[in-house]
Amino acid sequence: MSKRDFYEVLGVPKNASDDEIKKAYRKLAMKYHPDRNQGDAAKPAEEKFKEAKEAYEILSDAQKRAAYDQYGHAGVDPNMRGGMGGAEGFGGFAEAFGDIFGDMFGGARGRGGRQVYRGNDLSYAMEITLEEAAKGKEAQIRIPSWESCETCHGSGAKPGTSAKTCGTCQGSGTVQMRQGFFSVQQTCPHCRGTGKIIPEPCTACHGQGRVKKQKTLEVKIPAGIDDGMRIRSTGNGEPGTNGGPPGDLYIEIRIKKHDIFERDGDDLHCQVPVSFITAALGGEIEVPTLQGKAAIDIPEGTQAGKQFRLRGKGIKGVRSSYPGDLYCHIIVETPVKLTEHQRKLLKELDESLKKGGAKHSPSTESWTDRLKSFFS
């Protein structure tokens, strides 16, 4: 049987944001929770959840989503997480709930019974130039990192002492609480789910068993990246608790304002000033591009605002097959600080042009006619 479209499975459009995808998955996870689907409904619910889980795993990962968007199901490995098929069993089913409900309620249950928490995601803003965005680059960044405490060797206990089993939960990290007819399992309030009590905490790490330091990370910026895009570095967020998975690091790209170019998607725009003599008589001018210099032939009688397009002189975006174009917008420059001789020459030129009327200044003549019609 062919697989359904992943966007259809989650009920979201193809341009859905990460938050929309996550919310849709949460809704399905709650709907097909095993506690809500017993008896004959259990098996169909499990299949529905597996389908939603697979869709979420692909669409929540930027690289996998890009491959799926381009090639469909053939672009992603259906066994990338080692168990989408029927052999997964209830263990994998429960593990999948840990991913989503851990986000919702703070943590999932580990195999030893202790509360397992996923680490928090980290964000990092990186500023790059337009040239670096176009070509791509490799950079180093420093981010906070947790390392095992050298004083207590990660135990959290003062040297010479050791952690004790929590007497409240007997080391399980959870306690049973009765609410009417129901018995609810909750995190032990005494040890906070660790199953251990540290009578004498290590003074270096304050009983955490780890200390915060800085680490250097190599980051590859892909060519064509645009302002506001994020790069996900899996597992480089804050570490999890009690064996929980680490969070992710999201690097947000910010592109510095350029002195010459403005970016619009894959296209670039720039303003090119030319003298009114060149605009009137025409000629060749030199313009800058990200690849170097280029020449443009300015035709005779070029007006201010005229736009010239240089194909392929823009930027090739991250998901683009071809580079964009460069648009040069002409600004006709009016001369300033004229000498008396220059003023005289311009006045003579003006008188000569006026005699030609619409022949030399079609826009001015048309404007004059419209004004006469307006005030008449």
Swiss-Prot record:
Residues recorded as binding Zn(2+) 2, renumbered to this chain, are: 166, 169, 188, 191
Q: Which GO terms describe its molecular function?
A: ATP binding; heat shock protein binding; unfolded protein binding; zinc ion binding
Which sequence ranges does the entry mark as zinc finger (CR-type)? 136-214
* Gly residues compositional bias, start-end: 237-246
SUPFAM superfamilies (alphabetical): Chaperone J-domain, DnaJ/Hsp40 cysteine-rich domain, HSP40/DnaJ peptide-binding domain
Q: Repeat CXXCXGXG motif: residue ranges?
A: 149-156, 166-173, 188-195, 202-209
- For the region Disordered, give the residue spans: 227-246, 352-376
Chief subcellular location: cytoplasm
Q: Which cofactor does it need?
A: Zn(2+)
The record's annotation in PROSITE patterns points to: DNAJ_1, DNAJ_2, ZF_CR
Q: What is known of its domains?
A: The J domain is necessary and sufficient to stimulate DnaK ATPase activity. Zinc center 1 plays an important role in the autonomous, DnaK-independent chaperone activity of DnaJ. Zinc center 2 is essential for interaction with DnaK and for DnaJ activity.
Q: Which HAMAP family match?
A: DnaJ (MF_01152)
Q: What is this protein called?
A: Chaperone protein DnaJ
Its taxonomic path starts at: Bacteria, Pseudomonadati, Pseudomonadota, Betaproteobacteria, Burkholderiales
